[in-house]
Curated annotation (Swiss-Prot):
GO terms for cellular component: cytosol. It holds the Pfam family Cytidylate_kin. This is Cytidylate kinase. It comes from Burkholderia vietnamiensis (strain G4 / LMG 22486). The gene is cmk. It is found in: Cytoplasm. It catalyses: CMP + ATP = CDP + ADP; dCMP + ATP = dCDP + ADP. ATP binds at G17, P18, T19, A20, S21, G22, K23, G24, T25.
């Protein structure tokens, strides 16, 4: 059955889910297949988090964080995240930066400061946006909303592999504990808690390959009558 959601000339596919659920990889491949723009919303938060650390801004200093975000020079180019013209793609994936990003995201004004930047990524021919609240808050009119899930154990194993490949040392037990703590914090925060949109498609990637997950998203998109 086709969606009754109104047609938008610039379609958006949202892919939300917890940390290390595979949403970033799936989103990038779906975007590449469709020729769409890509928004890694988590990278925006991590860029703000990294900048706050580098400039010595406390995670609880809301006014300073908002001003920092307003003044940040952020660009995404050829798969790289740049802060002030410098590629910081590896820096923002460090666990400490991820924890800081989750900590500052609990502040409503911080989220408001980043919303406009996220929505500005919606450009023709379309956008694939991955994050935690893309389908519930940022793009509620998305033509397709996907929420990825996976067991904490599977996600910890993926995160461990990612970090080791990038040259970071990591302990899988510590990663598993951190993931569970972040899940609880992200799910229980007052502003835009981590949860699937009411009309989201749920996709458990625990036992799926990346290609299988991408194929499922594309099948759902085609089922809406969209060219894929």
């Amino acid at each position: 059955m086709k969606s009754t959601r109104p047609f938008h000339p610039t379609p958006v596919i949202t892919i939300d889910g917890p940390t290390a659920s595979g949403k970033g990889t799936v989103a990038a491949l779906v975007a590449a297949h469709l020729g769409f723009h890509l928004l890694d919303s988590g990278a925006l938060y991590r860029l703000a988090a990294l900048a706050s650390v580098r400039y010595g801004i406390d995670a609880q200093d809301i006014d300073a964080l908002v001003k920092l975000i307003d003044d940040l020079h952020i660009t995404f180019r050829e798969g790289c995240a740049q802060l002030d013209g410098v590629d910081v793609s590896n820096d923002i994936r460090a666990e400490a930066v991820g924890n800081r990003a989750s900590a500052i995201a609990v502040h409503g004004p911080v989220r408001v400061a980043l919303v406009a930047r996220q929505r500005a990524f919606r450009k023709t021919p379309g956008l694939v946006a991955d994050g935690r609240d893309m389908g519930t808050v940022i793009f509620p009119d998305a033509v397709l909303k996907v929420f990825l899930t996976a067991s904490a154990e599977a996600r910890a194993a993926r995160r461990h592999k990612q970090l080791m490949q990038k040259g970071f040392s990591a302990n899988i037990e510590n990663l598993l504990r951190d993931l569970r703590e972040r899940d609880a914090r992200d799910s229980n925060r007052a502003a835009a808690p981590l949860k699937p949109a009411a009309d989201a498609k749920l996709l458990d990637t625990s036992a799926l390959s990346v290609d299988q997950a991408v194929d499922q998203v594309l099948q759902w998109y085609r089922a809406l009558g969209q060219p894929a």
